[in-house]
Curated annotation (Swiss-Prot):
The keyword Transmembrane helix does not apply. Keywords: ATP synthesis, ATP-binding, Cell inner membrane, Cell membrane, CF(1), Hydrogen ion transport, Ion transport, Membrane, Nucleotide-binding, Translocase, Transport. Belongs to the ATPase alpha/beta chains family. Its EC number is 7.1.2.2. This is ATP synthase subunit alpha. It comes from the Bacteria. The record marks 374 as: Required for activity. Disulfide bonds: none annotated. It holds the Pfam family ATP-synt_ab. It is an enzyme of class 7 (translocase). Its main location: membrane. The gene is atpA. It catalyses: ATP + H2O + 4 H(+)(in) = ADP + phosphate + 5 H(+)(out).
Amino acid sequence: MQQLNPSEISEIIKGRIDNLDVSSQARNEGTVVSVSDGIVRIHGLADVMYGEMIEFPGSVYGMALNLEQDSVGAVILGAYDTLAEGMSAKCTGRILEVPVGKELLGRVVDALGNPIDGKGPLGNTQTDAVEKVAPGVIWRKSVDQPVQTGYKSVDAMIPVGRGQRELIIGDRQIGKTAMAIDAIINQKDSGIFCVYVAVGQKRSTVANIVRKLEETGALANTIVVVASASESAALQFLAPYAGCTMGEFFRDRGEDALIVYDDLSKQAVAYRQISLLLRRPPGREAYPGDVFYLHSRLLERASRVSEEYVEKFTNGAVTGKTGSLTALPIIETQAGDVSAFVPTNVISITDGQIFLESAMFNSGIRPAVNAGVSVSRVGGAAQTKIIKKLSGGIRTALAQYRELAAFAQFASDLDEATRKQLEHGQRVTELMKQKQYAPMSIADMALSLYAAERGFLIDVEVSKIGSFEQALIAFFNRDHAELMAKINVKGDFNDEIDAGLKAGIEKFKATQTW
């Protein structure tokens, strides 16, 4: 029997070790401890960053939101039915990014930027981070250019400027989305790109909106981002940030963009759900402590940036142009309670609010804008000259009318001045009514306001105001097309335009064709 030599054995082992090819890969990996309700707890991820993407087996991704001493709480983006305890999870070193660029115009995408409209892949697009820091004060420029919504009541009394944040607030089924969609439709030929973010809505509702945008030709310059009611809370929470990043692409390159968040109440509810599942301590109305920051960091990204900012961002490729991102966030109230937690937060963040009232809506005044409570803090400087000049008495007339109407119910005999104010207020209220999907041009709006301001409606029956306005606009667009085109292009108000409008209305009233 041959005896084994220990020194030979050790030499063989050493040789084997020397020849062994081990290509080591340094990576931060952990183990899934629990999976429930779209939340995953992971043990062993030592170097993970807040908001970092975490990769699970089967190309499932999550986002780290809770960094604790011995574990990490992450929220899953998408389906998580393939995940189980004991699976591995590894850091990617990247934060969440979504596709951006003009290739997205006319498309419907989910919160992660994946197309869901059946029109094929997006093609070559850039990507950008979902969470970004808003431009600093030095890089901003004051708001002095208008965004025409096409609504008389808004453009005359609560004007919106490029780079402004104007809240649309009111109860459910009162016309908030209709107002925002009309504002998007009105940008069809204005050169403003639009982003519509639908959060927690029914898919059928979103499909109807997309169809309407397509019919009116507004979808071609609009991006629709959808996180419907059937999507996870994580995607509903992320959708507004993703839409904002897509809008910032235009702002940072010297273009103008408009973004509608429909609505931020549902985003706050989704974030509350995530926070409670992550075992964060609840605060008022069970919302987490940072729900104000949730909305402030989103809405601060809407701004008007200076020429220097655009030039610096594009490395000198674009010069002498300012960029803007205008935000129209929507908040749904419960029984008109604007003093609830989320509504008061968003009111304090934004530059004004358009308050829609149930009582007005139910009485047939649509859009149901309450002129007394609605305000635009910075839009006045951006208002078109002719609209600004002619709308001065409109808000006063409406406010006085509402006050006097309540008083007149108790008074039997009214003096002449009060009666005239009531009659004028009735006609102005009727004039402010407008059909859905029928945004008005500057000239059409100026004509209506001129007729009200200069007393041309006094002898028109209240019930005939609507048909009078339609006939008047049709008459001017047919017989005074040059004057209307001039108003639309310049938006100025001078003696020549004043005389032209006056003569035209007098000529129209003489025909009695309404």
